[in-house]
């Protein structure tokens, strides 16, 4: 699968820059007002009681700021942040090594927590509830269990698939917050902030244009800004204007709703070859040369979000607003 400019997943080029662009405290964090306001209360209450913050689960599409919020929680609590991911913790012993190295009050961030192996999850249960580890030593009849006390800590779990979490794990989180797609207004503020950090001159109109095409996702907004900056330096005088941003994004094949050439190919295949649907996912996959799972997990969510596609028991259907966007007439039934 090719790396898409409008993907919310982390690209290699994002890694080095994202750290420098991340806000460090809640008052610097733009958007997600409900999540932010609730976290502010929970953090202040925990600090007043001189306790650790309850375990926090953050879920939502990629690129919305889950990792950033984990770091902010640690900063606001004045403690260290330890970062790992579900796939990186292969065995219970790996998790035990991480947990026993924590200092009192530390924040442990586990990204993609839905990908934890079940045997690892079971080690996590007593650690989250009672701040202890139950470890089996020996085998067979000589096996015995010993309990190791852990310092109080806060687990922050992040996932794009909350439904994939087991109920016992999900129930152990005291704070569960869903991150929503960002408004154009908030994304415009993020683009302006990033431009200032990167020392890029940009007009307010250009920032709005980049924000509109960013699919509600800060990571995409920052990536598009960097690409448009290249055009401003090579084809302009270094300043990103509305016209330059519009031209650059069209050359990058990102349309006014943030759809790229793959989105166009998928929608147009259903329109032109199957009369707008309904058509099965496997048929679509064979038509555009992609795996059905990739279409469901990567391409469809945003098209469903903006109302261009509908899932029905008989298959996928393209909606009238999608026809309008592409300047085509809705076929008569």
Curated annotation (Swiss-Prot):
Spell out the InterPro entries in the cross-references. AAA+_ATPase, AAA_lid_4, DNA_helicase_Holl-junc_RuvB, P-loop_NTPase, RuvB-like_N, RuvB_C, WH-like_DNA-bd_sf, WH_DNA-bd_sf
Annotated localization:
Cytoplasm
**Cytoplasm in keyword set:** yes
Record: residues binding DNA: 311, 316
Q: Sorted alphabetically, which Gene3D superfamilies does this protein's record hold?
A: 1.10.8.60, P-loop containing nucleotide triphosphate hydrolases (3.40.50.300), Winged helix-like DNA-binding domain superfamily/Winged helix DNA-binding domain (1.10.10.10)
Q: Name one GO cellular component term.
A: Holliday junction resolvase complex
Q: Does this UniProt record's set of keywords contain Lipid biosynthesis? A: no
Q: Can you state which reaction this protein catalyses?
A: ATP + H2O = ADP + phosphate + H(+)
Region annotation (Large ATPase domain (RuvB-L)) ranges: 1-182
| Record-listed Mg(2+) binding positions | 67
Head domain (RuvB-H) as annotated region, ranges = 256-333
Q: Between which residues do disulfide bridges form?
A: none
Provide the residue span(s) of the region labelled Small ATPAse domain (RuvB-S).
183-253
Binding residues for ATP, per the UniProt record?
21-22, 63, 66-68, 129-131, 172, 182, 219
Q: What's one GO BP annotation on this UniProt entry?
A: DNA repair
The alphabetical list of record keywords is: ATP-binding, Cytoplasm, DNA damage, DNA recombination, DNA repair, DNA-binding, Hydrolase, Nucleotide-binding
What molecular functions are annotated in GO for this chain? ATP binding; ATP hydrolysis activity; four-way junction DNA binding; four-way junction helicase activity
- Record EC number: 3.6.4.-
Provide the function of this protein: The RuvA-RuvB-RuvC complex processes Holliday junction (HJ) DNA during genetic recombination and DNA repair, while the RuvA-RuvB complex plays an important role in the rescue of blocked DNA replication forks via replication fork reversal (RFR). RuvA specifically binds to HJ cruciform DNA, conferring on it an open structure. The RuvB hexamer acts as an ATP-dependent pump, pulling dsDNA into and through the RuvAB complex. RuvB forms 2 homohexamers on either side of HJ DNA bound by 1 or 2 RuvA tetramers; 4 subunits per hexamer contact DNA at a time.
SUBUNIT field:
Homohexamer. Forms an RuvA(8)-RuvB(12)-Holliday junction (HJ) complex. HJ DNA is sandwiched between 2 RuvA tetramers; dsDNA enters through RuvA and exits via RuvB. An RuvB hexamer assembles on each DNA strand where it exits the tetramer. Each RuvB hexamer is contacted by two RuvA subunits (via domain III) on 2 adjacent RuvB subunits; this complex drives branch migration. In the full resolvosome a probable DNA-RuvA(4)-RuvB(12)-RuvC(2) complex forms which resolves the HJ.
Q: Which family does it belong to?
A: Belongs to the RuvB family.
Q: What is known of its domains?
A: Has 3 domains, the large (RuvB-L) and small ATPase (RuvB-S) domains and the C-terminal head (RuvB-H) domain. The head domain binds DNA, while the ATPase domains jointly bind ATP, ADP or are empty depending on the state of the subunit in the translocation cycle. During a single DNA translocation step the structure of each domain remains the same, but their relative positions change.
Q: What name goes with this protein?
A: Holliday junction branch migration complex subunit RuvB
Q: Per the UniProt entry, what species is this protein from, by scientific name?
A: Geobacillus sp. (strain WCH70)
What gene makes this protein?
ruvB
């Amino acid at each position: 699968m090719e790396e898409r400019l409008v993907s919310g997943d982390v690209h290699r080029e994002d890694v080095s820059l994202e750290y420098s662009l991340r806000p460090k405290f809640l008052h610097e964090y733009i958007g997600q007002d409900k999540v932010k306001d609730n976290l502010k209360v929970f953090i202040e209450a925990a600090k007043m009681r001189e306790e650790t913050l309850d375990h926090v689960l953050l879920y939502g599409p990629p690129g919305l700021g889950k990792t950033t919020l984990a770091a902010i929680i640690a900063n606001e609590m004045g403690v260290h942040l330890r970062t790992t991911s579900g796939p990186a913790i292969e065995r219970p012993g790996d998790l035990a090594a991480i947990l026993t190295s924590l200092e009192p009050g530390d924040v442990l961030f586990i990204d993609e927590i839905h990908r934890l192996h079940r045997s690892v999850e079971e080690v996590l249960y007593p650690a989250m509830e009672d701040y202890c580890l139950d470890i089996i030593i020996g085998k067979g009849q000589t096996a015995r269990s010993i309990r190791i006390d852990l310092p109080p800590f806060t687990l922050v779990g992040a996932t794009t698939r909350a439904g994939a979490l087991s109920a016992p794990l999900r129930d152990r989180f005291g704070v569960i917050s869903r991150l929503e797609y960002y408004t154009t207004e908030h994304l415009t503020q993020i683009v302006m902030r990033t431009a200032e950090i990167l020392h890029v001159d940009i007009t307010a109109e250009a920032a709005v244009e980049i924000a509109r095409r960013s699919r509600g996702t800060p990571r995409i907004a920052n990536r598009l800004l960097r690409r448009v900056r290249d055009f401003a330096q090579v084809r302009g005088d270094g300043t990103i204007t509305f016209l330059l941003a519009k031209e650059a994004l069209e050359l990058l094949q990102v349309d006014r709703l943030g759809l790229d050439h793959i989105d166009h190919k998928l929608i147009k295949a259903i329109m032109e070859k199957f009369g707008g649907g309904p058509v099965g996912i496997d048929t679509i996959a064979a038509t555009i040369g992609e795996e059905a799972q990739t279409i469901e997990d990567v391409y469809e969510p945003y098209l469903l979000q903006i109302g261009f596609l509908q899932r029905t028991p008989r298959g996928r259907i393209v909606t009238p607003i999608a026809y309008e966007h592409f300047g085509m007439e809705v076929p008569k039934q």
